[in-house]
From Swiss-Prot:
Subunit comment: Homotetramer.
Name of the featured protein: tRNA U34 carboxymethyltransferase
Role played: Catalyzes carboxymethyl transfer from carboxy-S-adenosyl-L-methionine (Cx-SAM) to 5-hydroxyuridine (ho5U) to form 5-carboxymethoxyuridine (cmo5U) at position 34 in tRNAs.
Binding site for carboxy-S-adenosyl-L-methionine: K90, W104, K109, G129, D151, P152, T153, I180, E181, M195, Y199, R314
EC number: 2.5.1.-
Annotated Pfam families: Methyltransf_9
Enzyme class, UniProt record, top EC level: transferase
Record's keyword annotation contains Transferase: yes
Reactions listed under catalytic activity: carboxy-S-adenosyl-L-methionine + 5-hydroxyuridine(34) in tRNA = 5-carboxymethoxyuridine(34) in tRNA + S-adenosyl-L-homocysteine + H(+)
UniProt family annotation: Belongs to the class I-like SAM-binding methyltransferase superfamily. CmoB family.
Length: 321
């Protein structure tokens, strides 16, 4: 089990201090509801060695190194422990000569998003649906004062804490295992990211409002989500599954998405990138035993999903509160 008290101490004297009114009780309730695998996964972090990196790079990668390389045996033991936390979805990580080659090349997405952002230097950042935290570390690498990720998935918390331990226990990033709908409106974050979340929401406008409620006035929203071609009235509502995913509800056109944001009261809304997801960005690796993008597409026509919908295309939208 993880101790969240260091995070409480961090935020006690910050603009997030109001969160202490609800968060400790919420996390106590969360711990009561965890399942058996969480206990097993959390113990794996205890088995990882306490290494001190001589060089950490979060600016161009998520990488830690020592001047003296690990022995083959040490490296294999770490790999063994980390593979107990499979599947690794978002990465990659380069830790002491170990390459965690995750399903997603999340560095590709970061390189698309980063040039358009308001500088993250000294900003308080929220990453909603952060997964195991790859992008959080890249945000720290850009100089963010503190990055808070929220994701209720127990495995992601354990993966994050494993990586943190191997990054000299860096406290500038913290993962809180809650959903955005469980957060009280803090209006405290300078930048809020929601990447790969909106299409999983039954009520997308509620999600956009929840994101807005976490931003300071004029703070920046970074929204990345699936889109389809079309006009302001075009919204794809899959009848059953989309790319084998059961929980996909609404995929708007870029114009429809901008309209949603306007209705929620955002301003300065702009689409800065639209990209079809490629097979080099999402694929099977030794760190993932499950199916990946190639299995979700029509084998005869990769412009369509296995169900016949348009293949995944993702837009990045920026807006201000």
């Amino acid at each position: 089990m993880f101790d969240f008290r260091p995070f409480y101490q961090q935020i006690a004297t910050s603009t997030l201090s109001a969160w202490l009114e609800t968060l400790p009780l919420q996390l106590k309730q969360w711990e009561k509801q965890t399942h058996g695998d969480y206990i097993k996964w959390s113990k794996i972090i205890d088995f990882l060695p306490h290494l001190t990196a001589d060089h950490i790079d979060l600016k161009s990668a998520v990488k830690a190194e020592t001047k003296t390389p690990l022995s083959s045996g040490e490296r294999q033991r770490i790999i063994h422990h980390l593979k107990q936390l499979m599947p690794w979805r978002k990465g990659p990580y380069h830790l002491y000569g170990i390459h965690i080659d995750c399903e997603w090349r999340s560095d590709f997405k970061w390189e698309r998003v980063l040039p358009h952002l308001a500088p993250l230097q000294n900003r308080l950042v929220l990453d909603v649906g952060c997964g195991s935290g790859y992008h959080m570390w890249r945000m720290v690498g850009e100089g963010a004062k503190m990055v808070v990720g929220i994701d209720p998935t127990e495995l992601f918390l354990c993966q994050f804490e494993a990586v943190r331990k191997l990054l000299n226990n860096d406290r500038r990033a913290n993962l809180i295992p809650l959903g955005i709908e469980e957060m009280q409106p803090l209006a405290a974050f300078d930048t809020v990211f929601s990447m790969g979340v909106l299409y999983h929401r039954k009520s997308p406008l509620d999600h956009l409002t929840q994101l807005k409620n976490q931003l300071v006035k004029d703070g920046e929203l970074v929204l990345e989500t699936l889109v389809v071609e079309g006009d302001i009235n075009t919204i794809l509502v899959p009848t059953d599954r989309y790319a084998k995913m059961k929980n996909v509800y609404f995929i708007p056109s870029v114009l429809a998405l901008i309209n949603w944001l306007e209705k929620c009261g955002f301003h300065n809304i702009r689409c800065v990138d639209v990209e079809t997801t490629g097979l080099e960005e999402q694929r099977k690796t030794d760190w993932l035993e499950n199916e990946s993008l190639i299995d979700f597409l029509n084998p005869q026509d990769h412009s369509k999903t296995i169900e016949g919908y348009p293949a995944p295309k993702r837009a990045v939208i920026l807006a201000n509160k």
